């Protein structure tokens, strides 16, 4: 409650949501990025300036979504550069290798939300065959590297 009082009194938002890319390696039915073309994406330098300005304004959290944020090679690099910001990166998990998970863990300011549709059949149906195992592997890599991560369950009827 104390935190919410501060947030409500704040003159600026505490969270900035960004979609550095709308590109994705999946073609999920019902996904808002499915039919979008990734044009006019901000460059790494432009994102760097945006995040610096966010810091200067007192914003504390950057939510990074997409598309698939890890299609870009600057997602963690920018978090490493802006240590005073907390980055919440929402991913489908398909690019999270052991090495990337370790880098995320070392950064100390990244929370990775890995989305999943449910069990094997649901996830594979919406994404593609084998996607469920990819998500579990990504989450396992994050867990083993001691990276702060959340499994984000997508519920739909």
Question: Where would I find each of the regions flagged by the language model?
Answer:
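Conserved alpha-helical substructure of the radical SAM core
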Residues: 1-102, 107
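Conserved strand-turn element in the central/C-terminal portion of the radical SAM core barrel
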Residues: 138-157
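Internal metal/ion-chelating core segments
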Residues: 88, 115-116, 138
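Short, histidine-centered active-site or binding-site loop motifs used for metal coordination
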Residues: 34-35, 116-120, 155
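Internal, well-ordered alpha-helical segments in soluble enzyme and binding-protein domains
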Residues: 100, 131, 135-138, 151
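Hydrophobic/aromatic residues located in beta-strands of well-ordered beta-sheets
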Residues: 62, 87-89, 112, 149-153
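Conserved radical SAM core fold
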Residues: 69-71, 93-98, 114-129
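Alpha-helix N-cap and loop-to-helix initiation/capping positions
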Residues: 42, 46, 126-134
